[in-house]
Amino acid sequence: TEGPYFYIPMVNTTGIVRSPYEYPQYYLVNPAAYAMLGAYMFFLIIVGFPVNFMTLYVTLEHKKLRTPLNYILLNLAVADLFMVIGGFTTTIYTSMHGYFVLGRLGCNIEGFFATLGGMISLWSLAVLAIERWVVVCKPISNFRFGENHAIMGVSLTWAMALACTVPPLVGWSRYIPEGMQCSCGIDYYTRAEGFNNESFVLYMFFCHFTIPLTIIFFCYGRLLCAVKEAAAAQQESETTQRAEREVTRMVIIMVIGFLICWLPYASVAWFIFTHQGSEFGPLFMTIPAFFAKSSSIYNPMIYICMNKQFRHCMITTLFCGKNPFEGEEEGASSTKTEASSASSVSPA
């Protein structure tokens, strides 16, 4: 059923269809499902905000963490905070009411910030892949990845993300309620007159999904070959090789985490786009959409767990300058120092 700025393609045996901007959507699923959704969003907020905020605070507090590589990682934390503050707070409120009580404006805000965070994350991972490729594979001789390159990389992620998220606000496609009708996303569902949804979805999938993923897979494919060759030839010291491998492993795990979170959503969205008019249940889009939102917590958790130097700095910040686990963290800085001088980034 299509109405002004909404579309409900779900299997609906009740025969009742009401605007998700005006009425609770309890005819789609049991009200308990909305309560569970609200609880899930509350969990993402109470975990996602402090973890990402601490990532920013600790990096700004400790000068040794302000390295070019960490600029991109900080960018991921900022993107996650945008998702938490601008998107999750909106969704928890709407799920408590069972419909998008905030109207079209709230839908645009939630859809914009959720999509913005995802796009910044994907393009940041593409920039990280390029950085790792340049540092480890050295396709450009005597090139040193410095602060200016990192700033350019961060600027690129925002430019590309805004190029994907702003058009639906100004008429090229639109944000509409999806799934259980209490969160919003790009309109993959309709060919609504005047919005050119088809051209936007094709543009989005090609320019803002296929291209960055191709960059990521190309760079890491070349990088894995280079790491094996360097290890076989012993071209660098064992300490440097170990440090570079640790950074590369961390970023690859971030990429895998992104794919696990966002690939189901992208696949379902593409299926809906190519099967417009088909009917499906309300959970078909809800589950992958809200699973994708968990990406706001996995990046900082991966960074904290796999980065000894950052973990040490965070512990000393939390314990007022002392590290009660000093024995476990000992030697982290010395392991990373040589790689920092070799690659012009601090891998940890």
Swiss-Prot record:
Alphabetical list of InterPro entries matching this protein: GPCR_opsins, GPCR_Rhodpsn, GPCR_Rhodpsn_7TM, Opsin, Retinal_BS, Rhodopsin, Rhodopsin_N
Key words of the record: Cell projection, Chromophore, Disulfide bond, G-protein coupled receptor, Glycoprotein, Lipoprotein, Membrane, Palmitate, Phosphoprotein, Photoreceptor protein, Receptor, Retinal protein, Sensory transduction, Transducer, Transmembrane, Transmembrane helix, Vision
Transmembrane region(s): 34-58, 71-93, 108-130, 150-170, 200-221, 250-271, 284-305
Localization of this protein: Membrane; Cell projection, Cilium, Photoreceptor outer segment
Transmembrane recorded as keyword: yes
Domain of life: Eukaryota
Parts of the chain on the Extracellular side: 1-33, 94-107, 171-199, 272-283
N6-(retinylidene)lysine PTM sites in chain numbering: K293
GO annotation, cellular component aspect: membrane; photoreceptor disc membrane; plasma membrane
GO BP annotations, alphabetical order: absorption of visible light; G protein-coupled opsin signaling pathway; visual perception
Family (UniProt): Belongs to the G-protein coupled receptor 1 family. Opsin subfamily.
Function description: Photoreceptor required for image-forming vision at low light intensity. While most salt water fish species use retinal as chromophore, most freshwater fish use 3-dehydroretinal, or a mixture of retinal and 3-dehydroretinal. Light-induced isomerization of 11-cis to all-trans retinal triggers a conformational change that activates signaling via G-proteins. Subsequent receptor phosphorylation mediates displacement of the bound G-protein alpha subunit by arrestin and terminates signaling.
Protein name as catalogued: Rhodopsin
Source organism (scientific name): Sargocentron microstoma
Gene name in the database record: rho
